[in-house]
C-alpha cells in the first residue's frame, strides 16, 4: 500500500482547502484494503478542521478528536479511514482532510502510513521519506 498527498499550494490565510490523499493498494497485495491509518504531522500555521471524508469513505475517526486541530510543527493527528468499497489489489481510492491556513509562511505537511495496511504507522518527522507522504503549502496574506 502507498499513500500520496497533495494540496492547492499557495492560498490565502483563512481560506479553507483540502489535503487530498490517494491510497493505492499494491498489485501484489494479499487482499483488498478496507481502511488506512495515517499520522499527520500538522505544521504551524495550519489548522485541521474535521475528519477525513470522500465518496468511498464509510467512516473516519481521529485522535485527538477535537477540531479545529491547530498545528504547531510537533502535533500529530492520527486518523483511521474506513472505505465503503474495499480497494482491490492494484486499485486506488481517495479522501480529503479539510484544513485552513492560519498564518502566513511556507511549510511542509507530512503524513505517515503503514505500507502493510496496519493501524500503527510510525510517527512522521519533517524529513520522513519512507512510508510517508509530504506536500508543501504556502499561506499568503489575503487580498
Task: Please provide the spans of the model-predicted regions.
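Exported/extracytosolic protein signature
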Residues: 1-143
Amino acid at each position: 500500500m502507498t499513500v500520496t498527498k497533495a494540496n492547492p499550494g499557495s492560498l490565502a490565510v483563512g481560506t479553507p482547502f483540502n489535503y487530498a490523499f490517494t491510497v493505492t493498494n499494491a498489485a501484489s497485495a494479499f487482499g483488498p484494503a478496507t481502511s488506512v491509518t495515517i499520522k499527520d504531522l500538522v505544521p504551524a500555521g495550519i489548522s485541521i478542521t474535521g475528519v477525513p471524508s470522500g465518496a468511498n469513505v464509510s467512516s473516519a475517526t481521529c485522535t485527538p478528536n477535537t477540531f479545529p486541530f491547530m498545528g504547531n510543527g510537533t502535533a500529530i493527528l492520527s486518523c483511521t479511514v474506513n472505505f465503503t468499497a474495499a480497494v482491490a489489489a492494484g486499485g486506488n481510492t481517495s479522501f480529503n482532510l479539510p484544513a485552513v491556513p492560519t498564518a502566513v509562511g511556507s511549510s511542509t505537511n507530512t503524513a505517515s502510513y503503514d505500507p502493510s495496511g496496519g493501524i500503527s504507522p510510525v510517527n512522521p518527522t519533517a524529513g520522513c521519506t519512507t512510508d510517508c507522504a509530504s506536500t508543501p503549502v504556502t499561506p499568503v496574506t489575503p487580498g
